[in-house]
């Protein structure tokens, strides 16, 4: 039983590392590193912003983001 658990953890670790390597490979920006070689397309990871929804409503969207100085004190 312990061997099966260790095996499953090892398999999940290998799968996680493979996905990480694939994402790192495709997120490499060849234009900023070597502008003369553009043989492979690169993509930029999208940044998401919060939009008004039924749960948050538009009132929470107008609050400014806390600055780093008062990040932990904002409630």
From Swiss-Prot:
GO biological process: cellular response to amino acid stimulus; negative regulation of TORC1 signaling; regulation of skeletal muscle tissue regeneration
Induction info: Down-regulated in skeletal muscle upon acute injury.
Keyword Ribonucleoprotein appears in the UniProt entry: no
Domain of life: Eukaryota
Tissue-level expression: Expressed in the skeletal muscle.
Chain ranges on the Lumenal side, renumbered to this chain: 1-3
Transmembrane segments: 4-24
Keyword Ribosomal protein attributed: no
Keywords: Endosome, Lysosome, Membrane, Transmembrane, Transmembrane helix
Compartments (UniProt record): Late endosome membrane; Lysosome membrane
Residue intervals annotated with topology Cytoplasmic: 25-75
A GO-annotated cellular component: lysosomal proton-transporting V-type ATPase complex
Complexes and interactors: Interacts with components of the lysosomal V-ATPase complex. Interacts with ATP6V0A1. Interacts with ATP6V0A2.
Protein name: Small regulatory polypeptide of amino acid response
Gene name per UniProt: Spaar
């Amino acid at each position: 039983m312990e061997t099966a658990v260790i095996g499953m953890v090892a398999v999940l670790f290998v799968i996680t590392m493979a996905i990480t390597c694939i994402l790192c490979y495709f997120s490499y920006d060849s234009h900023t590193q070597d502008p003369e070689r553009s043989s492979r397309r690169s993509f930029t990871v999208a940044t998401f912003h919060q939009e008004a929804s039924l749960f948050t409503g538009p009132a929470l969207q107008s609050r400014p983001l806390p600055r780093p100085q008062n990040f932990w004190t904002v409630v």
